[in-house]
Amino acid sequence: RATLGAARRVAGQGRVVACFQPHLFTRTRDFADGFGAALTLADEVFVTDVYPAREEPIAGVSGRLVHDAVLSHGGSSCYVADKAMLPEVLAGRVRPGDLVITLGAGDISLIGPLLLPLLQDTDA
């Protein structure tokens, strides 16, 4: 919440676009609803699949749980299971003045450098 609150202040009149990569299957299972509630502070949310780190997958646990929680709390969310597709998806959705922020403990921070070249030939 604090990070998105700060992003909101920095964005001014622009939208806050949050890209969230859940970290660990157990945390995603246990805290999906709380993550979803907090992420509604962003104007638009993009959720990727779970960064597993040391954990094995848990049946039925994916980033879709967080995506569904964002929606259930009244937010706007897009589930992008394949993180490699996220820069292209974002390039088609961001607008001039948007602040795009990546959140997560995995490799989600790699998205920014991949997104920038896609935006160079647009107005975003």
Model-inferred region functions:
Residues 1-124:
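ATP-dependent carboxylate-amine ligase
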